[in-house]
Amino acid sequence: MLPLRAFARLAQRPRLSRPTQLARSSLPRPSPSRPAAHYLALAPAPSTRFLHSSPPVLKEKRWLNNTPPEDDGEDGQNPKQDDQVEKPLPDAESSKSAEERAKSQSSKPDIKASSSDSVSSSAPAPGSADGGSPPGAGGPKEVAKPVIPEIYPQVLAIPITHRPLFPGFYKAVTVRSPPVIKAIRELQAHGQPYVGAFLLKDSTVDSDVVTDINQVQPVGVFCQITSCFTSQEGEGKPEALTAVLFPHRRIKINELVKSSGTKGDGTVGVGGLVEGSQDSAKGEGEVKSFESEVPGVEEVREELGTVSIDSEQPDVHKENRDLETKEVTQIDFLHSLLPQVSLTNVSNLSIEPYEKDSQVIRAIMSELISVFKEIAQLQPMFREQVTSFAISNTSSQVFDEPDKLADLAAVVSTADVSDLQAVLSSTSIEDRLQRALVLLKKELINAQLQFKISRDVDTKIQKRQREYYLMEQLKGIKKELGMESDGKDKLVEGFKEKASKLAMPEGVRKVFDEELNKLVHLEPAASEFNVTRNYIDWLTQVPWGVHTPENYNISHAIKILDEDHYGLKDVKDRILEFMAIGKLRGSVEGKILCLVGPPGVGKTSIGKSIAKALGRQFFRFSVGGLTDVAEIKGHRRTYIGAMPGKPIQALKKVATENPLILIDEVDKISKAYNGDPASALLEMLDPEQNKSFLDHYLDVPIDLSKVLFVCTANVLETIPGPLLDRMEVLEVSGYVSAEKMNIAERYLSPQAKVAAGLEDVNIELEPGAIEALIRYYCRESGVRNLKKHIDKIYRKAAFKIVTDLGESGLPEPATPPAENQVEAQYPDIKPASELTYNVIPGTEVSGVDTKTDVTTVPREPMKVPAGIHVKVTQENLKDYVGPPLYHKDRLYTHSPPAGVSTGLGYLGNGSGAVMPVEINSMPGKGNLQLTGKLGEVIRESAQIAMSWVKSNAYLLGITKSEAEATLNDRDVHLHMPEGGIGKEGPSAGTAILTAFVSLFTKTRVDPDIAMTGEISLLGQVLPVGGLKEKILAAHRAGIKKLIVPAGCKPDIDENVPESVKGGIEFVFVEDVRQVLHEAFRGTEVEKRWQETLPMEEEPQRERH
C-alpha cells in the first residue's frame, strides 16, 4: 500500500520543464502531455482525487495535509456546499487548449505523477469549474499534468480518409454526424479526450461511423483531442465540428461494441470527478477509508490494464493491497449513443523486439538521414519539417528512436495510401524502416523533378521579366520622344475592320477573336507575335461569303469559247450544259472536270476561256512533280515560314470564294517520303468533303464547294483510281490538218505577227505554206510545235526586213540624253561618271563601266516604210524554217515485196503514223527475232500471230499436209522501221499477221491498204484506241482502204471528221479470216482460201 505521504513526496520532486512548441498540423509537434506541468498545490483546504485510468469510482476523500474537516454535524462529516459541489467539465473548458495553462506554468517545476494520480489536461482543478482556487484557499491551485494511459481498452472510433495518422503528428479532422459530435463533447466533458483514428479502406466513403469492422484498416492510432471548434460549411447545412487530434501510439481494432452493452451510471475522467446519480445519492458518510480501498498497481494492471506506470515510481503494489474499486469502462457513458456512434475494443500494437545497435537498422537509418538531407537541400519547407522534428525529439541521438524516424519519413512523403498504411501496420522496426526508405526515395525523385521544373520555369520567367522591363523602358523612351504608338493598335484596328466586312462562320469568328485577343496581349518583340499576326492576316484574307456574280448567257459563252478556241466540241458542250443548269437553278455547285489529251491541244488555255465565259476569276497551279503534301494542305503553324496550301492561296489571290481553279498535270504527281499529294487532292476534289476543307495552317473548315475545278492530264493510266473516280473526264483529241489550218490562220499567225513587231507591216503567210508546215514539219496532234514554227517565220521576216533596209533606212528615233532625264527626275542621283567603286588592289571589276548611261524612258518603236512587203510561200518556206523533217508519209509507195504490210500506230506526242511491218526468214532453228525498239505488248502480238499462222499453215497453203512441221529449220526476223521511235501496244496484231502470211505464201499486199487491230490467239480481232490520229495519218499518206475492228465503228463515226474520212474505204472486220481475204483480194491464194479458209460472213464496208 502506498501511503498518502508518499504521494506528497512525489508531488514535491522537481522535474525540468520543456517549453511548449506550437507548430502546424503538418509539422511534428510535442505531445500535449509534454508542456510544463502545473504544481500540485499542497494547500490545506482543497481535496485531491486519485483516479484510475479505468473509470474508477470515488470511494472516499482524504486531505493531503491530514487536516480533518470541520465538524458540521453529529456524525462529524461536513456536508458539501453548493459552491463546492463538483460538476461536469463544461464544453467551453474542453475546447481550451491545455497549452495555455502550460505556458502560464512553464517556469515552474514539473511533477512526475504516477498512473494513479494522472489528471486530465482538459479538466479543471477540483472545486472550481474554471480551474481557479476554491473559496477560502490561501493561494493559487495548480494541477499536475497527466500521463497518457498506456492501455485504453475501449475508444470511440473515428474513420478518416486519404491518409493514415502517425504518432507524434497533429491532424485536424472534421465530423459532421450530430451523434458523433455529441460523443466528442461528452468525452471532453468527462475528461476522457481520447479517440481511435482508423483509415477507411474505400476512400470514396464519407462517414463518421464505422458500421463494420472490415470498413477500416485493422491498425490505427490512439489520439488525444487537443482542441475543437465548430464551423458552418454552408447555408442550410448542419454544423460541423473540427477536432485537432494528436496521435500517441498505434492500436489494433479487435471488435465493435454492440448497442446491447451495459451503460455505466457514471464516469470519472482523468483530472476531475464526475459523479453519477448513484454517487450523488450517497452521502459522504458512506465513503470508506481511502487507503484501505485503493487497489494495488499490479491489480489495476491485471484487471483493467489502463494505468501507465513510470519506471521510477515506487512499488505501490506492496503498499496498497487493500485499495479496491468498482470496475467500469472509461467511456461507459457513450453506450447510450449506440449504434449512432462506433465504439471499439482495441489493444496496443506490439512491436517485435529489436536491437538498437543492429547494423542493418543503423545502415537504413543512416540512408534515411542522407535522403532527408538531400531533400532538405531541394525543398525549404521540407527542411523546416526535419528541423522541427529534431527539436521535438526527446532523444539526443536519432539512432535511439528508429520508429519515430520511420514515421517522419511516412508523414512527409506523398506516397500512396496503401504504402503509408503498410508503414503504420508494420510491427518490425527493420521492415518499417525499409518501407519508409522506399517512400522517401520516391519523394527524393519527385523533389529533384520539381526542383528541375522550378529552375526551368524561373529561368523563363526571369527572361520574360527582363524583356518586359526593357520593353517598358522602351515605351517610356518612345513616350518622351513622342513615339508612343508602336503600330500594334493600328494593326489590331485594321484586322477588325477587315473582319467586319466578311461573313465569317461562327466557328471561324470565335477563332479570330481568340487570336486577336492573344495578339493584343503580346509584345511586338515576342517571337509568337509575328506568328499570330500572320495567322490573323491569312484569316482575314480568305474571302468569307464574298463571291462574284456569274454570267449564264449561253450565246455570250458560245461567242467567247469560239473566239478563243477552234474545235473542242465536247468541252464546249459540257460548259454550256453547266451554264444551262445554273440558269435554271439560279446557282450551281462546284464541279470537277478533267481534260485529257495529248500535249499542245489547248487544255490549259481552255480553262481560261471557261472562266471568261462564266465571269469567274481564274487561278492556275501545276502539280507536276509535286512531292510535298503541304503544298496542298498547308504547313503547320509551328514551322518557320509556314503558309497555307495552294487552294487557300488561290482564294486569297482572287478574293472570291467561287473562282475557277485549274490544276495542271495531275497525271504527273510524284510520291516521296513526306506523303502522297494525290491522296491529299481527294479531300479537295470530293464534292461531299470539300464543303469543310481543312487546311493545316488555318485549321478551320473552309467551303470549297463553290469552286469550279478543272484538271488537265495527258494520260489516265498514271492517275490514281480514287482520284479519277471523283472527276468527270473529257477527252480532248488531237487536231486534224483542217483544224490546224484554221487555228494557224485565225490565232497563231496574228499573235506571232504582233509579237515580232510586224503588226503594221505587210507580211503574207500563204495557206500553202501553212499546209506544208503541217504536213512536213509539224505532224504532232497539238499546235504547240506549229506555233513555234510560225513564230520562227515572223522572226526571220523581221530580221530580213532590218538587214535588207540597213541601218540608214531605219534611223534611230530621237531620244533625249539619258543622264538629263535621270537627273531631272531624280536630282539626288549622281551621274554615272561621278560614281566610284571600291576595288581591291590587283583585281578587276567585270561589268562595271563608269560611262554607262541609264534611263527610265521607254524606247520608241521603229516605223517600217509602207512599201515593204514580205510573202512566205511553200517554195521559200525552207528559207525560214529549214529543210523538211518528214520527206514522205510512207516507206513503200509502190508494190512492196512479200512479207511487208502497212500498219497504223499512235505516237507518244499524240499523233498517228503509218508504220510498215517487215518480215524476212533465213535458215536456222525456228527462232523469232524482233527489232525496232518494240515494247513488251507488241512482242506478245508477234508471238500470237506466229502461233496462229503455224496452227493454220495447212489451211493457208503453207504446208502440204497437216502433219508437216512448219519453220522448224528457219529463223524469222520481224522489224518495224524508225527504230529511234519506241513502239508499244497491241494494235499492230493484224498487220503482223498479214506480213507473216504474205511472206510464207510469197504473195504481195497492196500498199494502199493499211490496217489496225488487236488479235487473239484464236483469231478474233479486238478494238483499239487512237483511231482519229491513226486515220489522220492514213489520210495524210494517201491510204485508200483501212481494215479496222468492227468495235471501233462508233468511235470513228463520232469523233473522226468527214474531211479526214474523205476518199477512204473502211472495212470493219471481226475475224482474221476477213482481214486476210480483204488484204489479198483478187490473188491466187485468196481464191484457194474460199475453200480452205472461208469467211463466215462478209465484213461491213463504208466509203467516204
Swiss-Prot record:
Upper taxonomic lineage: Eukaryota, Fungi, Dikarya, Basidiomycota, Agaricomycotina
Protein's name in the database: Lon protease homolog, mitochondrial
Location of this chain's protein in the cell: Mitochondrion matrix
Listed Gly residues bias regions: 129-139
Span of domain Lon proteolytic: 895-1082
HAMAP family with a match to the protein in the record: lonm_euk (MF_03120)
GO molecular function (one): serine-type endopeptidase activity
Similarity remark: Belongs to the peptidase S16 family.
Quaternary structure, from the entry: Homohexamer or homoheptamer. Organized in a ring with a central cavity.
Function: ATP-dependent serine protease that mediates the selective degradation of misfolded, unassembled or oxidatively damaged polypeptides as well as certain short-lived regulatory proteins in the mitochondrial matrix. May also have a chaperone function in the assembly of inner membrane protein complexes. Participates in the regulation of mitochondrial gene expression and in the maintenance of the integrity of the mitochondrial genome. Binds to mitochondrial DNA in a site-specific manner.
Keyword Nucleotide-binding among record annotations: yes
Reaction equations catalysed: Hydrolysis of proteins in presence of ATP
